[in-house]
Regions:
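Nucleic-acid endonuclease domains
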Residues: 1-42, 49-135
Length: 135
């Protein structure tokens, strides 16, 4: 279990990542609070996952919407954000990435090398060639 301080830090890093992504895209973040999957993190429908360790994976959980793109954002110690890549939720849910390191909740840990280039994500959430995710 996380301490209240670690929880606060994780929440702040998440907000920094969401705002960094939105600034990079030139869009607005969602300002909805406690919607838990009902509303995407950003106006273009993306879910933002933040890391502070450059070697960490993008994590997708079983209750995450499968049709949304998930973007991995690295937040450094100066609150500078780097967009690392993205993947659709349903693409992330592969057995080879399923792990349960804490013994509480299995999740998919997608390696950075398996993410799509960030430049291929358009403002409306479509892949650059115009296709939509397959379900």
């Amino acid at each position: 279990d996380r301490s209240w301080f670690q929880h606060l830090k994780d929440e702040l890093v998440g907000v920094i990542a969401e705002n960094g992504y939105c600034k990079w895209k030139g869009i607005y973040p969602s300002r909805d609070v406690d919607t838990f999957h009902g509303v995407a993190d950003t106006a273009d429908g993306a879910e933002i996952r933040s890391i502070t360790n450059a070697n960490n994976c993008l994590i997708v959980r079983s209750d995450d919407p499968k049709e949304r793109p998930y973007v991995l954002v690295l937040v450094d110690s100066n609150a500078i954000c780097k967009m690392l890549g993205w993947i659709y939720g349903h693409e992330a849910m592969q057995d080879k990435w399923l792990r349960d390191p804490g013994g509480k909740r299995a999740s998919w840990f997608v390696p950075q090398k398996s993410l799509r280039p960030i430049e291929s994500l358009q403002a409306d959430g479509r892949v650059a060639n115009g296709t939509h995710p397959q379900h």
